């Protein structure tokens, strides 16, 4: 079986139906001995460009493992579901279980109070003559 990353965008008026959609698609995968490695609900987000005169949509990310027949059935159901505005399926080399950058960005957004302060950066250089590592810390200047 192959590994795939699937992102689909749901119409914002159908946001309350997203959990039922996820359940249905998950069952389609697991019924045929497939597996879901990562499932993330990114929620309603601003679209980069309008799709069908809509400016926001509900995003879902799935990393799955399935056979080609299951994938064809899944894509077929995406195409004929009017609530799904767009979908993208990408073949991956292996399973991905770590949080996506979108989820990491939500957790690591800096507070508004700490905008003016900059953390020191650390540069590590290898001194090949002595075989030792040299560590130098630099302060970022944030003068306005």
Curated annotation (Swiss-Prot):
Family matches, as SUPFAM superfamilies: Ribosomal protein S6
Region (Disordered): 95-144
GO cellular component: cytosolic small ribosomal subunit
Taxonomy, superkingdom: Bacteria
Family matches, as InterPro entries: Ribosomal_bS6, Ribosomal_bS6_sf, Ribosomal_S6_plastid/chlpt, Transl_elong_EF1B/ribsomal_bS6
Compositional bias of kind Basic and acidic residues: 104-114
NCBIfam families according to UniProt: S6 (TIGR00166)
Annotated protein name in UniProt: Small ribosomal subunit protein bS6
Gene Ontology terms: biological process: translation
One Pfam assignment: Ribosomal_S6
Role summary: Binds together with bS18 to 16S ribosomal RNA.
Keyword set, alphabetical order: Ribonucleoprotein, Ribosomal protein, RNA-binding, rRNA-binding
Family per record: Belongs to the bacterial ribosomal protein bS6 family.
